[in-house]
Swiss-Prot record:
UniProt cross-references to NCBIfam families, sorted A to Z: PRK01663.1, PRK13027.1
One Pfam family linked to the record: SDF
UniProt GO cellular component terms: plasma membrane
Gene: dctA
Membrane-topology descriptor: Multi-pass membrane protein
Stretch forming the signal peptide: none
Chain segments annotated as transmembrane: 4-24, 44-64, 76-96, 142-162, 184-204, 222-242, 289-309, 326-346, 352-372
Keywords: Cell inner membrane, Cell membrane, Membrane, Symport, Transmembrane, Transmembrane helix, Transport
GO molecular function: fumarate transmembrane transporter activity; malate:proton symporter activity; succinate transmembrane transporter activity
UniProt-recorded name of the protein: C4-dicarboxylate transport protein
Family recorded in the similarity comment: Belongs to the dicarboxylate/amino acid:cation symporter (DAACS) (TC 2.A.23) family.
GO biological process: L-aspartate transmembrane transport
Cross-referenced Gene3D superfamilies: Sodium:dicarboxylate symporter
Length: 428
């Protein structure tokens, strides 16, 4: 029993995070030097994301009997994403108005360091809806894979899958090659995942060493408020959706606990994307559904980021005594419904979208972003964790709606009673 515990990735990552926190707190300079360990692990994961998505989507689509099913899956997924992300935005807006974490700070925007957020504000101006949609189309196929742009790779994979499906038996050889290549890729993922504890240790040691636990105190109320809101969203909103769909959110969280710990350590939901593709398929969701929903969700279903955006924007208004009436807040909500969809594949995307939104609304001081900049790194964990759980739940929900969910397998896996190698019929 003890041996299996020490060998489990869950235990190893959890221990690594704890050691990283201690090192960063007691030896901050040394902790800050651990940054390359976390960066290297995240880069290894990002290296493999493009081929994983390509193989999963192509084999999933090419292996389907009807192409109408693919279109139906995409439409249902986008509808679900819009509804749930809107709920997340509204919840963030309600909670920040009730708790008012920025009230009483009385910050003068003129005293803030506007230069600290100048880079983000400049990037925000480049992030528009038209630019976002145009960016989905790659300049070249090689460029899409080289840059690791998820949506560009996804678009090419969907087109490739459609074309391969139309070839019928003539494309069987190509299908077999891609499927075999997929097995090799997942073998590489298993090797990379053995380094997850080292990556989590390095990232956490750097965060605590560079920013320090003490830096959380001044703006701690916003951080606590945000974390509690994310927890409530997962338990209440996603929990209700899961219950209606026919599974327990708590059992689902237990099922993806290793992925959640990796995300917690690295603050990057992308670090768990390859394993989520594999795990959701093992949970009973058809490969074609998983291949479409998970990668698309990383751009259109960022529940944690949605909560963060409304809370951060209103917090800045409260802290700088910038009055926001109901009209201003509705305007903020509408702008965020559009701007939050343009965060795909951008480093520091949440903060950049926040800068774009504040600039678009025009009622809030852009310099107020400096208040959030210092604590944004500590809020990224909750964003990433909520995004991951949200995309996992979305995959199961969409799979059920389009009748591509193996209900028996779902129940067996979540209740730890799935026999190895046993398959079930897809429920209708």
């Amino acid at each position: 029993m003890k041996t299996s515990l020490f060998k489990s990735l869950y235990f190893q990552v959890l221990t690594a995070i704890a050691i990283g926190i201690l090192l960063g707190h007691y030896y901050p300079e040394l902790g800050a030097q651990m940054k390359p360990l976390g960066d290297a692990f995240v880069k290894l994961i990002k290296m493999i994301i493009a081929p994983v998505i390509f193989c999963t989507v192509v084999t999933g689509i090419a292996g389907m009997e009807s192409m109408k099913a693919v279109g139906r899956t995409g439409a249902v997924a986008l509808l679900y994403f819009e509804i749930v992300s809107t709920i997340a935005l509204i919840i963030g807006l309600i909670i920040v108005n009730v708790v008012q974490p920025g009230a009483g700070m009385n910050v003068d925007p003129a005293t803030l360091d506007a230069q600290a957020v100048a880079v983000y504000a400049a990037q925000a101006k480049e992030q528009g809806i038209i630019a976002f949609l145009m960016d989905i189309i790659p300049g070249s196929v090689i460029g899409a894979f080289a840059s690791g742009n998820i949506l560009q790779v996804l678009l090419f994979a969907v087109l490739f899958g459609f074309a391969l499906h139309r070839l019928g038996s003539k494309g069987q050889l190509i299908f077999n090659v891609i499927e075999s290549f997929s097995q090799v890729i997942f073998g590489i993922i298993n090797m990379i995942m053995r380094l997850a504890p080292i990556g989590a240790f390095g990232a956490m040691a750097f965060t605590i060493g560079k920013y320090g636990v003490g830096s959380l105190v001044q703006l701690g109320q916003l951080i606590i408020c945000f974390y509690i809101t994310c927890i409530l969203f997962v338990v209440v909103v996603l929990g209700t959706i899961a219950r209606v769909t026919g599974f327990s959110i708590f059992k689902f969280i237990r099922y993806i606990r290793e992925e959640l710990l990796i995300v917690l350590g690295t603050s990057s939901s992308e670090s768990a994307l390859p394993r989520m593709l594999d795990k959701m398929e093992k949970l009973g969701c058809r490969k074609s559904v998983v291949g479409l929903v998970i990668p698309t969700g990383y751009s259109f279903n960022l529940d944690g980021t949605s909560i963060y955006l409304t809370m951060a924007a209103v917090f800045i208004a409260q802290a700088t005594n910038s009055h926001m009436d109901i009209f201003h807040q509705i305007t903020l909500l509408v702008v965020l419904l559009l701007s939050s969809k343009g965060a795909a594949g951008v480093t520091g995307s949440g903060f950049i979208v926040l800068a774009a939104t504040i600039s678009a609304v025009g009622h809030l001081p852009v310099a107020g972003l400096a208040l959030i900049l210092g604590i944004d790194r500590f809020m990224s964990e909750a964003r990433a964790l909520t995004n991951l759980v949200g995309n996992g739940v979305a995959t199961v929900v969409v799979a059920k709606w389009v009748k591509e969910l193996d209900r028996q397998k779902l129940d067996d896996v979540l209740n730890n009673r799935a026999p190895d190698g046993k398959t079930h019929e897809i429920s209708s």
